[in-house]
Amino acid sequence: MTQALQLVKSELLINRETIEEMMKIEKINKEGACYLLQYKDKMNEASSDSLNYYGYFPFQSQDFLPVTDAMEMLRASSVMQNIKNKELAVEIIQAYAVIKNAHLFYEGFSKAKETAVEKCVSQQEFRKISNENKSLREILEFTILLPEGFAAMRQISFVHDDPHLTYSHYMKLIDETITFIDKEYN
């Protein structure tokens, strides 16, 4: 029993780290989009360091998958039924639901971003300039002035109002489950 729950705890920690990474990526994307929008008509005034930091994020994507092997093992074996404290069993199930929700939340951001950016990069003008020997500043300046590029940056900046708040809530619930496992089985 203790060994199985230690596996669950390890898996919850892995998923928590992933959720934290999703939060960071979404926040950086939002910050970058806001930065580019701020310098829409004056890209020459934007910091080169900031452009190098933020400029590539709109065109990159990263997918995450939840890790649920330990939970599947609990369900397939009799371990879940043998957990004496039923509140803990329920909390573990809820923690995995939270993990799923976090991934769906990130996926919502990711798909909205992807759709908006695709409308921009599919424009013939964008394809033409991105194949020329232009600096990142020139490409971003051109991109943000395209109606589709401007719309993409606005979409990225508005997808979720406060991702930090939502992801932090998810991580807090996972932390509470980990603490509960430690309290019961350590």
Would you name each region that the model predicts?
Residues 1-186:
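Long, hydrophobic alpha-helical segments that serve as membrane-spanning/inserting helices
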